[in-house]
UniProtKB/Swiss-Prot annotation:
One GO location term (cellular component): extracellular region
UniProt binding sites for Ca(2+): 17
Family the UniProt entry places it in: Belongs to the venom metalloproteinase (M12B) family. P-III subfamily. P-IIIa sub-subfamily.
Tissues expressed in: Expressed by the venom gland.
Listed name of the protein: Zinc metalloproteinase-disintegrin-like daborhagin-M
Keyword Hydrolase among record annotations: yes
SUBUNIT field: Monomer.
Cell compartment(s), UniProt: Secreted
Function comment: Snake venom zinc metalloprotease that possesses high hemorrhagic activity (minimum hemorrhagic dose, MHD=0.86 ug) when subcutaneously injected into mice. Has potent fibrinogenolytic activity on alpha-chain of fibrinogen (FGA). Hydrolyzes model substrate (beta-chain of insulin) at Ala(14)-Leu(15) and Tyr(16)-Leu(17) followed by His(10)-Leu(11) and Phe(24)-Phe(25).
The organism's taxonomic lineage, starting at the top: Eukaryota, Metazoa, Chordata, Craniata, Vertebrata
Length: 25
């Protein structure tokens, strides 16, 4: 479901992981 895809993108945990990945790079 397309609604479930953006849901995980808007998740706070996903955002934190994204920042960590960028910070680690």
């Amino acid at each position: 479901v397309a609604t479930s895809e953006p849901n995980r993108y808007f998740n706070p945990y996903s955002y934190v992981e994204l920042i960590i990945t960028v910070d680690h790079s």
